[in-house]
């Protein structure tokens, strides 16, 4: 019988329940989500284009005359409808995902001035993608539930036995193309994010999985 591969490694700080966790687990979760939010903020400040899901929100807003915030909310709701057949459940991490990322995204864009030189903007964008990927990988290893879109990624990986890299990249590129066709604005940063974030998340998951104290199934 073929050995099952874990999509997300079971770490020493992983929660045993979606709604209860030790102080260490919560601390790591909050740290990871804050890093993710800062990374998102740096991408926004770079001015090189929004993330693919934001491009889709823009496109839907243009086609429906909805506010972009409402479009984003409706997308999240639509994505979570797919959770049930993928056997995904809400957890504490799902709720904190929404709150903490938005908080640190706002803080980052308020305290840092957007760069003007193209080189500096590229640096902001690249560092933002790395932080976004690291934060995503780290918070998922807490096993307290994923955000709506990350949950979709994990669910597809588990259902079809695919890697995070393949699924995340496919989702981001597909969403980017759909958003563009609907009228959303695609920039260099959007393309960089869509084509690299899957590899970045997979890279950090592989590093975490190979820490000596973490049992990991290959």
Swiss-Prot record:
It is found in: Cell membrane. The keyword Transcription regulation does not apply. One of its GO terms (cellular component) is plasma membrane. Signal peptide: none annotated. InterPro entries: YczE/YyaS-like (IPR038750). The chain crosses the membrane at residues 28-48, 66-86, 92-112, 122-142, 173-193. Its main location: membrane. It is a multi-pass membrane protein. Keywords: Cell membrane, Membrane, Transmembrane, Transmembrane helix. The keyword Ligase does not apply. This is Uncharacterized protein HI_0522.
């Amino acid at each position: 019988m073929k050995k099952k591969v874990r999509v997300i490694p079971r770490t020493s700080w992983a929660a045993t329940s979606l709604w209860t966790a030790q102080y260490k687990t919560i601390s790591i979760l909050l740290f990871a989500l804050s890093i993710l939010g800062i990374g998102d903020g740096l991408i926004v400040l770079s001015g090189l284009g929004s993330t693919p899901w934001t491009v889709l929100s823009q496109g839907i807003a243009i086609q429906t005359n909805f506010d972009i915030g409402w479009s984003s909310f409706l997308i999240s709701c639509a994505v979570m409808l797919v959770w049930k057949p993928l056997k995904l459940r809400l957890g504490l991490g799902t709720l904190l995902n929404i709150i903490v990322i938005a908080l640190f995204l706002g803080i980052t864009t308020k305290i840092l001035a957007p760069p003007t030189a193209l080189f500096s903007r590229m640096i902001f964008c690249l560092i933002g993608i790395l932080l976004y990927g690291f934060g995503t990988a780290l918070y998922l290893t807490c096993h307290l539930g994923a955000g709506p879109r990350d949950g979709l990624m994990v669910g597809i990986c588990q259902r079809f036995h695919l890697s995070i890299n393949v699924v995340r990249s496919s989702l981001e590129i597909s969403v980017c193309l759909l958003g563009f066709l609907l009228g959303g604005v695609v920039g260099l940063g959007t393309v960089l994010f869509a084509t690299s974030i899957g590899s970045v998340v997979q890279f950090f998951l592989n590093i975490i999985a190979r820490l000596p104290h973490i049992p990991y199934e290959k």
